[in-house]
């Protein structure tokens, strides 16, 4: 069995191998290499070697010499919809259009089409520390960020690999200043078809044919909703509501009781929300955390690849509206409390029973 790392992503590479060794099987051991930063979107394609070269690529083969070896990823729009993201060169787009050689979608289509190719192990699953140039602490290869928050690509693979009906909509629907401008809306699903609504008005349905579904929509604030349909019935939905100014926080814990002295980790995901409880996807508020009772703070993170703060500090700046707090129980029993505070934000408390 032959394994292919990055060069296995290039046009014709796997076919060349199979032509010369038709009796051998292969596995894509480090394929595909694609980038995403959670909550970041660009409508025009990014190629690493051209747009954000790795240290080992600088001064090496230039883009003009390399571009014939990559699988095309068309721009979603003629002009960039999110030019403000150019202020953040270390963040990559979540439209599955930031890559080294091939998109995640094309890579899986290719894997399915070659019976002698046993599968692929994408690089990587989680963002990880290292292999990053200052001021980054990690690369953006993962489909889950370094705070263990899923990115949009996570749901792409869910649509490909699961049978439970699902639909995932991107991007979020809070784009102040872009009223009337065209926004690419992408949907991942495993349903027969998806119908899209803006403010309860249908924009029509599209059949699922194994590819992502794309609408180009003039932005208007309000509600965007995707409804997944199977056998004529709605079986899955996803929606976003346009957010107003940050007002409070929402706390969601993976557990609300834990045994005393346990090595279990309590993971609390925090969203900045507006006065109506709608998540604010651009919020970057600084939050402080106070832990009382039989609990202790293990660490905090926000998924930002360029933040270098100590993990054990009792405060954190949210990244794209989110952050995560990790707690653990002490030896004593009782009620533990996490208090979350932020400037001009409503304070919130979360109680954990230590039993």
Where are these regions (language model features)?
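Beta-strand-rich structural segments
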Residues: 185-189, 227, 263-281, 287, ...
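Short, hydrophobic beta-strand segments
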Residues: 214-219, 311-331
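Edge beta-strands of extracellular beta-sandwich domains
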Residues: 232-244, 346-354
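Short, solvent-exposed loop/linker segments at the N-terminal edge
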Residues: 175-180, 257-266
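Extended substrate-binding grooves/exosites of carbohydrate-active enzymes
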Residues: 1-207, 214-219, 223-233
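Extracellular Ig-like/FN3 beta-sandwich strand-entry sites
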Residues: 219-223, 265, 333-335
């Amino acid at each position: 069995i032959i394994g292919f790392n990055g060069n296995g992503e290039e046009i014709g590479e796997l076919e060349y191998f199979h032509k010369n060794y038709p009796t051998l099987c292969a596995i894509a051991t480090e394929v595909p290499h694609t980038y995403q930063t959670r909550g970041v979107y660009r409508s025009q394609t990014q190629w690493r070697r051209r747009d954000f070269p790795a240290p080992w690529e600088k001064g090496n083969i230039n883009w003009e010499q390399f571009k014939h070896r990559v699988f095309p990823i068309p721009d979603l729009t003629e002009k960039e919809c999110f030019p403000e993201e150019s202020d953040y060169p270390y963040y990559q787009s979540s439209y599955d259009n930031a890559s080294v050689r091939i998109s995640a979608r094309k890579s899986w289509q290719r894997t399915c089409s070659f019976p002698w190719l046993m599968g692929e192990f994408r690089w990587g699953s989680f963002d990880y520390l290292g292999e990053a140039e200052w001021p980054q602490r990690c690369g953006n290869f993962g489909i889950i960020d370094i705070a263990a928050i899923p990115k949009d690509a996570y749901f792409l693979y869910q649509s490909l690999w699961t049978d439970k009906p699902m639909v995932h909509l991107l991007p979020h629907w809070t784009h102040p200043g872009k009223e009337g401008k065209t926004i690419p809306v992408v949907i991942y699903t495993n349903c027969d078809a998806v119908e899209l609504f803006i403010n309860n008005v249908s924009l029509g349905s599209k059949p699922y044919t194994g590819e992502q579904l794309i609408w180009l929509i003039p932005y208007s604030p309000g509600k965007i909703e995707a409804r997944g349909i199977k056998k004529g019935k709605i079986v899955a939905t996803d929606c976003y509501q346009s957010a107003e100014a940050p007002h409070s926080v929402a706390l969601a814990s993976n557990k609300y009781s834990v045994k005393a002295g346990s090595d279990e980790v309590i993971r609390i995901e925090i969203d900045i929300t507006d006065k109506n409880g709608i998540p604010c996807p651009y919020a970057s508020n600084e939050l402080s955390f106070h832990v009382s009772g039989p609990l202790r703070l293990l660490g905090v993170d926000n998924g930002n690849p360029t933040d270098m703060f100590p993990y054990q500090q009792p405060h954190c700046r949210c990244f794209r509206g989110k952050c995560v707090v990790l707690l653990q129980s002490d030896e004593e029993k009782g009620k533990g409390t996490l208090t979350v505070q932020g400037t001009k934000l409503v304070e919130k408390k979360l109680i954990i029973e230590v039993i």
